[in-house]
Amino acid sequence: MCDKKDVSPQKDQYTFLANCALGLEELIEAEIKGFSGVEVELGKGTVQWQGSLETGYRACLWSRFSSRILLKLSQFEVNSEDDLYQNSFTYDWHQHMSWKTTFAIDCTLSADATVGHSQFAALRIKDGIVDRFKEDGDERPSVKTTQPDVRFHIHVSGNEGTLYLDLSGESLHKRGYRVAGGMAPLKENLAAGIVALSGWPEKQEALPSLIDPMCGTGTLLIEAAMMFGDVAPGLARNYFGFLHWHQHDSQLWQALLDEAVAREDAGLDKTWPSFQGYDADPVVVSSARKNIIRAGLDEFIQVKCSPLVHLGAPTDRGMLICNPPYGERLSETEKVRQLYAAFGRIGRKHFAGWDVAVFISNPDLAESFRVSWEKKYRLFNGTIACRLSTGVFAEEEENSFAWEIQQVEVQEDALQFANRFKKNLKKYLKWAKKENISCFRVYDRDLQEFNLSVDLYEKWIHVQEYLPPKTIDPDLASRRFNIALRAIREILGLRSDRVFIKKRQRQKGAGQYQQQGDRKKMHQVREGNCYFLVNFRDYLDTGLFLDHRPIRLRIGRESLGKKFLNLYGYTGTASVHAAQGGAASTTTVDLSSTYLQWTEMNFSLNGFAENNHRTVKADCIKWLAEETELYDTIFVDPPTFSNTQKANRVFDIQRDHIQLLTLAMRRLSPGGLLIFSTNFRRFILDEKLAEQFDVKDITRESIPLDFSRNEKIHFCWEFRQK
């Protein structure tokens, strides 16, 4: 017989153990001391204490952060599975249950446990219980894995086994109000820990508004409201593991329930702060409303279906708290990074001075919010290591950057180019400031000898060298380009890390989609009220066609309440403008996975979720032939030529534009508008289209001032049904 220590509870003296998510131990310690627990000891994910039965009951009813509350029953030596059976067989189970009592056994093992299989260890304990009752002349008690009358827990660490009664019966995160969870619901006890560590409970008088801008099913808001209203988290539960325990003190438990009801009634009568939640997913918002009603807090918490981009502050002070998407998969990380950037930008713009707390899994992405974090806590959401970061939103800084023309003497061989470049700068910088434009062209092959274009993107400059005519010596062209580049740097006083150079040449087939280098570095720029990611290094084009600026701005102005379709959508910039303009939905179709991912990042950067803004990977002509939806506005900006092996087709804009536009017009709703643009310099629109549709040439008005020197930068038409 193995050594056995009887630690069965004596009257008014019990040993309890609370299990919890890693990082919540100190919060539980404070709770236990508030319940009059003594000799509190913290472990890794555990809190042990001594106290009366009342302290255990209070922990079950009031602990917001614990997962389970265990009552220590016995401790014994374990050198094999047989020792588990022998100690179970000799234990006096009658003090806790009868043969009519349903029961369950859980088992956990430390890494150095002398037994190697938790399920088999639990089975040996179960066998000992059953055989004990049979030995005593009773019938065999029944095992019930879900909500048994009593649940026992055995933990083996090294060669020491400890037997517990699970007072909670099932995890205490099950408050009883959750009707449905989202894709990855946050457990209630972890949510409560996030709220507590955010500092809001102590600051709530100074922070009269609590907003979760990505509220999911509302767990953070519900837990915060329960804290404020002094609502016991276990009050709505109808199951605990002690209700059929033979030593259960029903009078004590009823007294604690009555006290909790009285405290809740008093809490609900207080003057409440504002609790608001928002989410872009209407299905999730519906679940949140159901949970809030189930929790009895629908009078105090309001949730609405709205994307992050529409967030605004209802009061001067408050707190934004959220558990945003993590982006655990590599393909989602960049999209999540842009969502965090949007959250930070919106926070600085509309919530300056507000407290903020975000719970994320990747600490490297915390920088994306651009918040000076004051505190950081390491917590675990299941097995995922996470960080809770808290701070205050600083006021959004005005973009103080401005291009300045330096008063420098350029070398004689650069005079011709320098004079024209400075003249253009004066003209277009003044124009851009007046029109609130930050990305524009300032030189477009104005001089035949200097065959390049120069674009300004915020504080970066993008220089493109074009292949010289065959009549020009390549070495001479190269020298001229270097002369111009030197002059550009001197006139604008540029650091080398702000200048990006590309050599343009005719792209064939998939070449237009190929990377120009190995590194991918994105920069954020603004156009109107939209923000976009541009890449100056890795692809021939940056991700933002500057000559289409007027078209995109028009789409934004005219999209309120409309369904928008973007064919050959590239990086989705027109779709984002439509969304910012209040489009009911956007659909962006492109055959390139790279550009569709880029589109999704652009949407995230602007604070839009994917619910009403879908991306479709498809050949546009094939997709149009199968599509059945109608759209109010359609933008068609196809390539001049593409040879796509995956689609097994060659596209030629001159040859195929009748088929393309005819199919697209079938998807145009009555009274709708289709805008067609092409940059094929020798393009001729087939006259048959004008016979079939109401066609208007808007090329001149669609070309902005900074591209007016090149009348064939693109052609553009409006199409309407006759």
Swiss-Prot record:
Locations listed in the record: Cytoplasm
List each coiled-coil range: none
Domain THUMP, by residue range, is 55-167
Q: Which domain of life is it from?
A: Bacteria
| SMART domains assigned | THUMP
Q: Which GO terms describe its molecular function?
A: 23S rRNA (guanine(2445)-N(2))-methyltransferase activity; RNA binding; rRNA (guanine-N7-)-methyltransferase activity
Family to which this protein belongs: Belongs to the methyltransferase superfamily. RlmKL family.
Q: HAMAP family from the entry?
A: 23SrRNA_methyltr_KL
Which protein is depicted?
Answer: Ribosomal RNA large subunit methyltransferase K/L
Q: What is the name of the gene encoding this protein?
A: rlmL
